[in-house]
Every structure is written in C-alpha cells, then in structure tokens.
C-alpha cells in the first residue's frame, strides 16, 4: 500500500494560513512589503560595498555575499508564500518541491558558513591586527567564500537526496509556507533510518559546526578584550556587536526549527519561526549592519550627498 501511495504522489499542496481566510490579504500585503524591503535593503548594501573603497575590507566582502544570499534565500520562499496566501493554497509538483528544498538548503547553508567566516574575520581583526591584512588577502577571501559555496552545495545535495528518497504516503498536504524538512517528515512512511541519519549528520555539520567556529572565535575575542585598557574595551567590542546580533537572530531560529525532536514540532510555531528566518531576519540584516556601523553610515551619507548635488 505504501508503494502505491508513493507512486501516486506527484505533487504537494501547501496549505499554510488557509484556516484564516480573513487574514490572507493583510498577510499578503505585509509579507510583500517586507520582501520588497529585504530585496532593496540588501541590494543597497551590496551597491554601497562595491562603490565605496573604504568598504573593500575583508569584513565587507563577506557582508556583500551575506546580503546576496539573503536576497536569494528570501526569493526562494517568499514568492511561494505569497502565492499560498493569494490562492488560499498552492499545488507544487514533486520536482518543483525538491528544487525549492535544494535551493533553500543551499542558500541557507551558505548563510551559516558566511556567518562563521565573519566571526573568524572579527577574531583576526581583534586578536591578530598586525597579521589581519596579510592573512585575509584577496586570494584568501575568494578561497574562503568559494569554500562556503562548495560546502553549501554538498550540504544541499546530501539533504535533498536524503529527504526525497523517503517514502511519502497518505495525505500530500503540507501545512507550511514552502517545502521544508519538518513538514515533509510528517508525510513519510516505511523504513527511513538511513535517510534520517544523513539528515541528522547534515544538521550537525552545518548548524552546530558553524556555531562552534563562532563561539570559539568570540571566546578568543573576549579574552583579548579583557587584556586591553578598560577605556578601549567597549570601542573594540563594538566592532563585533552587529555580527553578534545577526548571529543570535539567525541561529536562534534555526536551532528552534531544526534541532528539536519531532514530538516538539508544532505547525503553528514552525510557520511563525519560518517567517522569522525567511522574511524578518533577511530584512533586518541591512539595518543591523548599517545602523551600528560608522563606515557603512558614512558610505551611505556620501552617496546621498552625491545624489543631492546631481
């Protein structure tokens, strides 16, 4: 019977928020507005970094890639979410669901690795300032980012193959805003031990491994800051606050979503958290890095002054 059901599954039906039809239009307009702010804010960050020579430092090189990933990350999920709200549900073919799942994992994994690299960048800037420029040369930066992209590709391939070799039976309805692992696991049946082990290995390799790099980097940073005069401690640590804020928001939602047991999974909670990491956090990142960064604010001021003069 499971095999028959498996052969009949040719599409999935996304039904998130369909139980609240009166909220469909307000949520559609809200999420559309947030998506536009996300795209414009992150593209503005990328343009600022490309145009201002003061922002050609390693940290901003990594930040430009993070901004690009945030645009891609949101663009994979938000248009689908808007379609679900507008049409009160949306059908997604098996292949399209797998493709969305792969791209979401790809961009999300790269986000994790980039945040880890940015923590390493802050470690070098604070703990090894004399060697900072010589270690993070242009070639080194390109190699690190290329490594993040390759690791993201491998992670996405492993996770997607593991998830979509599972047997799906029963209902094909997904009470979620896009094709993601927690709701898909609720549709599985039959033997899935090997795939679940691979999925767990992915979660350990991407999320906790990135967090270990971040935590170790900041441990060394804190130790280094404790060794400098009290008057300079706040100024030195302020260079890390933007990154720490972004890390706390991003990894906090990922841990809640992916590192809990299946018994703790709630459709409503998962939907709220998914909106946080697909819409809210990518929208806030440009604000976090610009409002708390003097160099970015100065670059923005220069461009605005040029626009006024022209």
Swiss-Prot record:
Residues in the Cytoplasmic compartment per record: 47-54, 121-139, 218-236, 292-310
Residue spans crossing the bilayer: 26-46, 55-75, 100-120, 140-160, 198-217, 237-257, 271-291
Annotated GO biological process: G protein-coupled receptor signaling pathway; sensory perception of smell
One of the Pfam families matching this protein, by short name: 7tm_4
Superkingdom in the source lineage: Eukaryota
A molecular function (GO) term: G protein-coupled receptor activity
Keywords attached to this entry: Cell membrane, Disulfide bond, G-protein coupled receptor, Glycoprotein, Membrane, Olfaction, Receptor, Sensory transduction, Transducer, Transmembrane, Transmembrane helix
Cystine crosslinks: 97-189
GO annotations of cellular component type: plasma membrane
InterPro entries: GPCR_Rhodpsn, GPCR_Rhodpsn_7TM, Olfact_rcpt
Locations listed in the record: Cell membrane
Principal place of residence: membrane
Extracellular compartment residues: 1-25, 76-99, 161-197, 258-270
Membrane topology category: Multi-pass membrane protein
Glycosylation positions in this chain: 5
Function as written in the Swiss-Prot or TrEMBL entry: Odorant receptor.
Family in the record: Belongs to the G-protein coupled receptor 1 family.
Descriptive protein name: Olfactory receptor 9Q1
Originating organism: Homo sapiens (Human)
């Amino acid at each position: 019977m499971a095999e028959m059901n498996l052969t009949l599954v040719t599409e999935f039906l996304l039904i998130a928020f369909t139980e609240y039809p009166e909220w469909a239009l307000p949520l559609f307009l809200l999420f559309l507005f947030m998506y536009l702010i996300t795209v414009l804010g992150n593209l503005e960050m990328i343009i600022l970094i490309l145009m201002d020579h003061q922002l050609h430092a390693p940290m901003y090189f990594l930040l430009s890639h993070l901004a690009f990933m945030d645009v891609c990350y949101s663009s994979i999920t938000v248009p689908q979410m808007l379609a679900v709200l507008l049409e009160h549900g949306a059908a997604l073919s098996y292949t399209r669901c797998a493709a969305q799942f792969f791209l979401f994992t790809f961009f999300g994994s790269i986000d994790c690795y980039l945040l880890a690299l940015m923590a390493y960048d802050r470690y070098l800037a604070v703990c090894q300032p004399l060697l900072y420029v010589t270690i993070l040369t242009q070639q080194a930066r390109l190699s690190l980012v290329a490594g993040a992209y390759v690791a993201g590709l491998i992670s996405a391939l492993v996770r997607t193959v593991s998830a979509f070799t599972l047997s799906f039976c029963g209902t094909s309805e997904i009470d979620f805003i896009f094709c993601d692992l927690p709701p898909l696991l609720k549709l599985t049946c039959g033997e899935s031990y090997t795939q679940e082990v691979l999925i767990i290995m992915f979660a350990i390799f991407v999320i906790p491994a990135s967090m270990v790099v971040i935590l170790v980097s900041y441990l060394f940073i804190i130790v280094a800051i404790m060794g400098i005069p009290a008057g300079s401690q706040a100024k030195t640590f302020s260079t890390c606050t933007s990154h720490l804020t972004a890390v706390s928001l991003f990894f906090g939602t990922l841990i809640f979503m992916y590192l809990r047991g299946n018994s703790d999974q709630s459709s409503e909670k998962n939907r709220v958290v998914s909106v946080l990491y697909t819409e809210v956090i990518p929208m806030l990142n440009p604000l976090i890095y610009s409002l708390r960064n003097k160099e970015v604010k100065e670059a923005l001021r220069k461009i605005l002054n040029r626009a006024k003069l022209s």
